[in-house]
C-alpha cells in the first residue's frame, strides 16, 4: 500500500476507535436544533414504507442497539401499532442527528442500560410526590438538559399516540424505550463533519 494511502486509513481507523469507545459529557447545549428536528419530521412524514425501511437499514448499520431496543418490545407484549410509533420516533431522531451533520458513536447495550437505570431511578424518586410524576422524572433526564427539542418531540409523539398512561403496564415499555432513545443520543459521543468531537 502506498504511504499516502496508509496515513488517511490509519486516521480513519483511529477516529472510528475513539468514537466507538467514547461517552459524552461535553456541553449541555442542544446539539440538534429545532430547525434540524423540523426538517427530520417533515422528511419522515413524506416517506413511504420502502423509504422508512431504507432508513431502518441505515440505523441497523450505524446504531444496531437502538433499533433492537425498539424491535424487542414485541417480546414484552407491546402491540405492533405501539412499536410502529417507536420506529417512527427512532427514524425522526436519526434523521435529526443526520440533519445536524453529526455522527454518533455506537450506543452500546451497556450505555442503554446505564441510561435506563438513571431514568427509572428518577421515576422511582418522584413516584410518591404530588403532580405528574412522569413530567417530573423527565425533567431529571440528561435529554431534558441536553436535547430538549428531541425530548419534546418524543414526549409529544407518545402523547399523540396515547402511550403516556404509566398506569397501563404495556404503556410503560414504550415510554421507557422512547425516553431512553433520547437519553442515549444525548449522552453519545459525536463528531461533526469537520471531524471535531462534540
Segments predicted by a language model, with ranges:
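Long compositionally biased, domain-poor regions of proteins
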Residues: 20-198
Amino acid at each position: 500500500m502506498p504511504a499516502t494511502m496508509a496515513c488517511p486509513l490509519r486516521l480513519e481507523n483511529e477516529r472510528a476507535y475513539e468514537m466507538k469507545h467514547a461517552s459524552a459529557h461535553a456541553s449541555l447545549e442542544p446539539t440538534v436544533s429545532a430547525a434540524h428536528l423540523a426538517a427530520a419530521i417533515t422528511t419522515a412524514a413524506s416517506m413511504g414504507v420502502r423509504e422508512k425501511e431504507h432508513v431502518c437499514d441505515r440505523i441497523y448499520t450505524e446504531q444496531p442497539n437502538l433499533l433492537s431496543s425498539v424491535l424487542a418490545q414485541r417480546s414484552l407484549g407491546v402491540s405492533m401499532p405501539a412499536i410502529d410509533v417507536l420506529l417512527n420516533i427512532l427514524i425522526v431522531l436519526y434523521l435529526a442527528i443526520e440533519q445536524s451533520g453529526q455522527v454518533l458513536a455506537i450506543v452500546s447495550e451497556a450505555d442503554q442500560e446505564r441510561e435506563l437505570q438513571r431514568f427509572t431511578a428518577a421515576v422511582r424518586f418522584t413516584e410518591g410526590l404530588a403532580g405528574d410524576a412522569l413530567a417530573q422524572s423527565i425533567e431529571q433526564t440528561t435529554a431534558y438538559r441536553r436535547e430538549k427539542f428531541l425530548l419534546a418531540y418524543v414526549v409529544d409523539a407518545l402523547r399523540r399516540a396515547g402511550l403516556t398512561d404509566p398506569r397501563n403496564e404495556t404503556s410503560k415499555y414504550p415510554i421507557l424505550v422512547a425516553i431512553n432513545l433520547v437519553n442515549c443520543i444525548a449522552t453519545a459521543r459525536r463528531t461533526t463533519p469537520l471531524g471535531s468531537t462534540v
